[in-house]
UniProtKB/Swiss-Prot annotation:
The keyword Hydrolase applies. This is GTPase Obg. It comes from Vibrio atlanticus (strain LGP32) (Vibrio splendidus (strain Mel32)). InterPro entries: G_OBG, GTP-bd, GTP-bd_Obg/CgtA, GTP1-OBG_CS, GTP1_OBG_dom, GTP1_OBG_dom_sf, OBG_GTPase, P-loop_NTPase. PANTHER family: DEVELOPMENTALLY REGULATED GTP-BINDING PROTEIN-RELATED, MITOCHONDRIAL RIBOSOME-ASSOCIATED GTPASE 2. One of its GO terms (cellular component) is cytoplasm. Monomer. Its main location: cytoplasm. It is found in: Cytoplasm. The keyword Magnesium applies. The gene is obg. Residues 160-333 form the OBG-type G domain. GTP binds at residues 166-173, 191-195, 213-216, 283-286, 314-316. NCBIfam families: Obg_CgtA, PRK12297.1, PRK12299.1. The lineage of its organism: Bacteria, Pseudomonadati, Pseudomonadota, Gammaproteobacteria, Vibrionales.
């Protein structure tokens, strides 16, 4: 199945049903009181995480999703039926972003989590709502409001513990092949990896972690060069980043400048991602004598001013890879998982939140003209008489 991690859709929540103007009629009661019911609320649109899905490919073919409209109110104080909701099933780790405002509308990182992305319209109010001591025969009602319409960009963020980044041909895919059962494509030309891939690394029985390999970055990726930085979003939920550095690039480029390029592109993309724990991994140490490799690595570390963890490996010959995986397992076991706090100020505002308050204050009210009722006398309304057999 083709891996699709981004799709654009248009969602439309259901319109609210209209309120109605109606009066109670019965034998011997020529002119009863108001009994117009409210309309039904429009259906909402949700996204729900489903662990059985792993791609957004379905949303490439069907781009429009809408919930049901609420029914109109009826006489006899009958309220209209609420419109059915529309639930869009998406892979775990999907977020919905408003295309026009770039606002993150929803994010589902757990199986079964369900979040509203489009609010249905409010129901209109029937004329019963406007009855008062000075208005015994109200002809006012309110119309149901339109459901919310949004254009969303669905983005799938892979849920991995370790994220790998580096220039093309640095050896990221080779490393994943050597430490897991994943088999990403490996070749001696740039951009062999075109889509992200995941590998599960088992350190000890019943303990494992997931490594994400993303396509390589080049200078200017933040401006769209190469494959751009669209795949860097997959690193946002990673707990540790491995920066793979080729100490002997096949094109003769400077490893120090290559490392600085990756760091610069990462910082341009997101300060939050750049602040994550990051380890340097020097690959292809078997291509030169050990002493020469150590000198080269020390030169790079000093040039970068690096004070964190760094490792020497040969991914193709599996030199140092086992030790690196054990260190990663120990580090993540002691590293608390990030818990994203939902702040009140970041709550998404939907339309029509104050609609009913405005309606009861006299705004958005529709008055129906009906001359047949203009001469209705309050004194003729004796109430609803119920006859009971003895």
């Amino acid at each position: 199945m083709k891996f699709v991690d981004e799709a654009s859709v248009k969602i439309e929540a259901g319109d609210g049903g209209n309120g109605t103007v109606s009066f109670w009629r019965e034998k011997f009661v020529a002119k009863g009181g108001p009994d117009g019911g409210d309309g039904g609320d429009g259906g909402d649109v949700y996204i729900q995480a489903d662990e059985n899905l792993n791609t957004l490919i379905d949303y490439r073919f069907q781009r429009f999703y809408n919930a049901e409209r609420g029914e109109n109110g009826r006489g006899g104080n009958c309220t209209g039926k609420r419109g059915k909701d529309m639930t869009m099933k998406v892979p775990v780790g999907t977020r919905a972003v408003d295309i026009h405002t770039n606002e993150i509308v929803a994010e589902v990182a757990e199986h079964g989590k369900k979040v509203m992305v489009g609010k249905g319209g409010w129901h209109g109010l029937g004329n019963t709502r406007f009855k008062s001591s000075v208005n015994r025969a109200p002809r006012q009602k309110t119309m149901g409001t339109k459901g919310e319409v949004r254009e969303l960009r669905l983005e799938l963020l892979l849920l991995a513990d370790v994220g790998m980044l580096g220039l093309p041909n640095a050896g990221k895919s080779t490393f994943i092949r050597s430490v897991s059962a994943a088999k990403p494509k490996v070749a001696d030309y740039p951009f062999t990896t075109l889509i992200p891939s995941l590998g599960v690394v088992s350190v000890v029985p019943e303990k494992s972690f997931v490594v994400a390999d993303i396509p390589g970055l080049i200078e200017g990726a933040a401006d769209g060069a190469g494959l751009g930085i669209r795949f860097l979003k997959h690193l946002e939920r990673c707990r540790v980043l491995l920066h793979m550095i080729d100490i002997l690039p096949i094109d003769g480029s400077d490893p120090i400048q290559n490392a600085l390029t990756i760091i610069d592109e990462l910082e341009q993309y997101s300060e939050k991602v750049a602040q994550k724990p990051r380890w340097l991994v020097f690959n292809k140490v078997d291509l030169m004598p050990e002493e020469e490799a150590d000198e080269k690595i020390q030169e790079i570390v000093e040039a970068l001013g690096w004070e964190g963890e760094y490792f020497k490996i040969s991914a193709v010959n599996k030199i140092g890879t086992k030790d690196l995986c054990f260190k990663l397992g120990e580090f993540m076991e002691n590293l608390p998982r990030e818990v994203e706090a939902i702040e009140e100020e970041e709550k998404v505002n939907f339309m029509w939140d104050d609609y009913h308050k405005d309606a009861m204050a006299g705004k958005n009210v529709v008055t129906e003209d009906d001359d047949d009722w203009d001469d209705w006398d309050d004194e003729e309304d004796d109430g609803h008489v119920i006859y009971v057999r003895d």
